[in-house]
Each structure stands twice: as C-alpha cells, then as structure tokens.
Regions:
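Amphipathic alpha-helical repeat scaffolds of TPR domains
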Residues: 2-16, 38-58, 80-109, 137-153, ...
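Residues in the short coil linking paired helices within alpha-helical repeat scaffolds
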Residues: 22, 60-63, 117, 156, ...
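Charged alpha-helical initiation segments
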Residues: 2-6, 16-18, 240-364
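Charged, amphipathic alpha-helical oligomerization/scaffolding segments
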Residues: 120, 202, 209, 313, ...
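Flexible helix-coil transition and linker loops at the boundaries of alpha-helical arrays
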Residues: 30-44, 71-87, 125-140, 169, ...
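Single-residue signature of alpha-solenoid repeat helices
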Residues: 26, 64-67, 121, 160, ...
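Elongated, non-catalytic scaffold/linker segments and compositionally distinctive motifs
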Residues: 126-297
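Short non-catalytic regulatory patches outside canonical folded cores
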Residues: 345-397
Length: 397
C-alpha cells in the first residue's frame, strides 16, 4: 500500500468517526495527519469538509471558520479547478454551520434575511448546482437537500420544498431530503386550514420512512436521526387516536376530460410551474391543488365591520392581478391560429439586435409588468396591515 493510499484510508477513518459522533477523536486524528504530511494536496482538499463537519459537531465556531477559510483559499488555486464543485458544496455547508452556531431561532428575523453567512451559503450552493449533473446521484441528492435547508433558513419555505423535490427526483428514498421536506411541510400545516390534518399525517409518514432508513446516519449523522424522531413525537401529540397517522391518504387526480384545449393547457402549465395559490403542497395532481383558496384570517374588535372588509379588498385586488398575470403568461405560451393571424396584422421593424415583437411576446411582457406591479401592492398592503410609519407612494387599488 503506497503512502497516498494510506492517507485516503486515514481520511476515510476520520469521516467514520464524524458519522459516529466522535468529533474530538476526529479532530485529533486530522491534526495528527496534517502534522505528518504538511502541504499534502489530498489532505488540503479533504480537510475543508472534515473541519466543517467536526466544528459543527463540537459547536466550535473557530474550527468551522478554519475549514471555510481553507476552502475559499483553494477556490483561488487553479490547480484545484477540477474539484471546485465539491469545494463550493463544502464551503456552503460551512457558511450554514457558521450561521447556525452564531444565531438561533429567537433572533430578530432581519438578522436571518440579511445574514452574511446565509447569503454566502446560498451563493456557494448555487455555484455548485451549475455543474452538479456531472456527479453521482448521491452527491446531487445531498447538494439539493442542503440547498433546500439553506432556503428554509432564509424563510423561503416553499422554494425549499421545491429543492427537496429535486433531491427526491434523483432518489425518492433519500432520507435527509425526505425528513427535511416533512419538517418544512409541518410549518405550512398549521396555516393550511382544511389540509392541516392531512399534512401532519403525510409529514409523520415521511419522517418515519426517513428515520427507519439505514442510510440516514451516513448522510445526516446521529443528530438527524434524533431530530426526525423528535418531530414524529411532536406530531403524535397532536392526535388522540394515533392510528390516524397510518391512514392511507388518497388524492384523486383532477379531471381534464371536460375542459377545452386551452383550459387543459392552462391547468397543466400552471400546475407544472406551481403557480396556483394554495397550501396543498403534499400532492399537486388533484383538484385541491389547482385552485386559489389562500386568504388571511384576522381578529377584529367587536362591532368593527370595516377593518376586515378593507383588508379583504387589498387581498382580492392582489389575487385578481395575480390571476390575470398568470393567465397572460399561459396565453403567451399557447400557440393559436387566430392569435397568429392577429399578430401578422401588425408590422414591426427589424432592429437587427435579435429583439422579438409579436402578440405572444407582448403577452409575456404584459405578464411580467403585471407581476411586478403586484409587488408594489403587496408592499402597500403590508404597510397598511402593520400600520408602518412609511410614506405612501402612488399605488392605487
């Protein structure tokens, strides 16, 4: 056995110590290996991820930081060009760990949204995702899962669910993606109205599947297994009859047979791109997933008959504008002979810069403008709802 192969074996042994939760032994072994083999490329590359995992396990900010700094340094070294995707991935995990060690859930939400470590993690994950298709399924699933965790920490829960779905497309039984998706779904369960029970049941079943998966500890360590088991217990407390949690949930697929050609396209297009406003996130191929029931609930003083109606007008207008923008988007993607003929009646100058002008492009541009206008109205609504001391701008409902 040559020296390089021996080092790989030692690195593998350190990784096993981490998976078993023996972090102090792992850091001692890594430091000893570094001392014996200074400036070794294999060690320099692998220690980035090892330091981050060990520091996270020991809750040692400085060890994690050391791993991140080492990784950032290697990214600037052209001799590690072939390893940059793995480096981006490890560094992103490091920034996530720095965030988790520095802040907790009780902190001000502004420190989450603008947190430098979270933003750095998001950027590094995205860099890794650009070229991830060249890697094996295991790495791709883990990358999408960790990116989902980052989005969830940023308060972008719906996008996090989409990231977990990407991981599960690669491996439908990937335990970390399955468990983390279930935990993200739990957040939405309590605000999903009539879907609350079904979402808790689905979350419980997914968590059990993840916690019983023999590969869970390999990918997430002992902490992930304990975390998932704790979530299962929390869900069980919500149900007097625990047998309900084993119920087989059925979601009959929506019926397209009675629809016109465009309506069918519209439903499938909006469903594919998740454009409907509902919390039926545990199943997207049934009738409940292709409607827009989302609204708000609020408590007003007895005798106050105006506040809720005034707020409702804001929401109605925002939802109406959204529905129109969505319709325009779908129309821009649906080729029709009558629109083709109408488009031909308007002459456009060829500006020689590859710009496109026609009815379909116009519909797409209008959808974009309408959507952007909605953002202004949402900001105005938030200002009114929370009675923020911000000057009004010319936004009309």
């Amino acid at each position: 056995m040559n020296k390089e192969h021996e080092m790989v074996q030692e690195i593998y042994a350190i990784s096993n110590l981490i998976n078993k939760g023996e972090y102090q032994k792992a850091i001692d072994s890594l430091l000893n290996l570094e001392t014996k083999n200074p400036e070794n490329r294999t060690i320099n590359f692998n220690k980035v991820g090892l330091l981050i995992d060990i520091g996270c396990g020991l809750k040692d900010f400085d060890i994690v930081k050391k791993g991140v700094v080492a990784g950032e340094k290697l990214l600037k070294d052209s001799s590690y060009e072939d390893y940059k995707v793995t480096l981006y991935y490890n560094i992103a995990n490091g920034y996530m760990s720095l965030y988790q060690l520095e802040y907790d859930k009780e902190r001000d939400v502004e420190r989450i949204v603008d947190n430098e470590n979270l933003q750095n993690a998001k950027r590094k994950f995205r860099e890794a995702l650009k070229e991830v298709n060249h890697f094996d399924s295991e790495f791709r699933s883990q990358l999408w899962t960790n990116y989902g965790n980052c989005l969830d920490s940023l308060g972008r829960g719906v996008e996090a669910l989409y990231a977990y779905d990407e991981a599960l497309k690669i491996d439908s039984n990937f335990p970390i993606a399955l468990g983390n998706k279930a935990m993200a779904m739990r957040f939405f369960a309590d605000i999903s109205g009539e879907y609350r029970e079904a979402m808790h049941i689905k979350s419980s079943q997914m968590l059990k599947s993840a916690s019983e998966n023999k590969d869970l500890v390999k990918f997430g360590g002992i902490a992930a297994k304990k975390g998932f088991e704790n979530e299962i217990q929390q869900i069980e407390k919500l149900f007097e009859d625990k047998r309900v949690l084993s119920k087989n949930l059925k979601h009959p697929k929506y019926d397209l047979s009675y629809m016109t050609k465009f309506e069918k396209f519209y439903i499938e297009f909006c469903s594919k791109h998740k454009l409907f406003l509902n919390f039926h996130i545990h199943e997207d191929k049934c009738e409940a997933s292709i409607v827009d029931p989302i609204f708000i609930s609020m408590v007003t003083p007895i005798g106050d008959s105006e506040t809720y109606n005034n707020i409702a007008k804001y929401i109605n207008q925002i939802k109406e504008d959204y529905a129109i923008a969505r319709l325009l988007l779908a129309q821009s993607q649906f080729k029709r002979e009558d629109l083709d003929n109408i488009s031909k009646r308007t002459t456009f100058v060829n500006t020689l810069d590859y710009s496109m002008f026609n009815i379909y492009v116009g519909l797409l541009k209008s959808a974009f403008k309408e959507t952007y206008n909605i953002l202004d109205k949402i900001s105005r609504f938030i200002k009114e709802y929370y009675k923020l001391n911000i000057k009004n701008k010319n936004i009309y409902f």
